[in-house]
Amino acid sequence: MAKVLVLYYSSYGHVETMAQHVAEGAKSVPGVEVTLKRVPETIPVDQAKAIGVKVDQAAPVATVDELANYDAIIFGTPTRFGNMAGQMRTFLDQTGGLWMKGALVGKIGSVFASTGTQHGGQETTITSFHTTLLHHGMVIVGVPYACSGLVDMKEITGGTPYGATTLAGADGSRQPSANELDIARYQGKHVAQLAAKLAA
């Protein structure tokens, strides 16, 4: 049975919502075991609460060593100046031991993201994230244009061939749209299907 991990960091809940839908899509594939986890928060709890960070997320916190247990990992992160969030970077910077052992070589890696604005770095966040995955020897999977939501021109929407995205708005008030969640589910399903084939 293929094992898929959806691993995310979310400050205000947007990436958390996307992660839940990515996991839902992955779970729709028979013969795949899906786990949803988050990386540790690095901001002290009192400070995090003071700035509105959602500290009560249900997903358990992952450990670095467990990454080797999965056939595919779908990472989710908000954007920080066109790059992944510091919390995700801190977590991945602890994977040197896995790299030394080649523990992630040949496993699928995929990324989804959230940005504050339409041109806030959603694509560069994902493609710069890919650099770390390539150093680990992972096989990168995005969202193919077979996903019709990528060409939706009826509304302002996230979604790229590099991975699902959502636009949170400058004040964080915009929640993931139906189209963005559809793309997230598609990404989860697509990765899970490929993981199942590789694990067969």
Curated annotation (Swiss-Prot):
Record's cofactor remark: Binds 1 FMN per monomer.
Sites where the protein binds FMN: 10-15, 79-81, 114-120, 135
Binding locations of substrate: 99
Alphabetic keyword roster: Flavoprotein, FMN, NAD, NADP, Nucleotide-binding, Oxidoreductase
Keyword Nucleotide-binding recorded: yes
Catalytic activity: a quinone + NADH + H(+) = a quinol + NAD(+); a quinone + NADPH + H(+) = a quinol + NADP(+)
EC number(s) from the headed UniProt entry: 1.6.5.2
Family according to the record: Belongs to the WrbA family.
Residues that coordinate or bind NAD(+): 12
Flavodoxin-like domain span: 4-191
InterPro entries from the UniProt entry: Flavodoxin/NO_synth, Flavoprotein-like_sf, Flavoprotein_WrbA-like, FMN_Rdtase-like_dom, NQO
Signal peptide per UniProt: none
Protein name: NAD(P)H dehydrogenase (quinone)
PROSITE patterns attached to this UniProt entry: FLAVODOXIN_LIKE
Keyword Endoplasmic reticulum among UniProt keywords: no
Natural source organism: Burkholderia vietnamiensis (strain G4 / LMG 22486)
GO molecular function: flavin adenine dinucleotide binding; FMN binding; NAD binding; NADH:ubiquinone reductase (non-electrogenic) activity; NADP binding; NADPH dehydrogenase (quinone) activity
One CC-aspect GO term: membrane
Cofactors demanded by this protein: FMN
PANTHER family with a match to the protein in the record: FLAVODOXIN-RELATED PROTEIN WRBA-RELATED, FLAVOPROTEIN-LIKE PROTEIN YCP4-RELATED
Enzyme class of the recorded protein, top EC level: oxidoreductase
SUPFAM superfamilies documented for this protein: Flavoproteins (SSF52218)
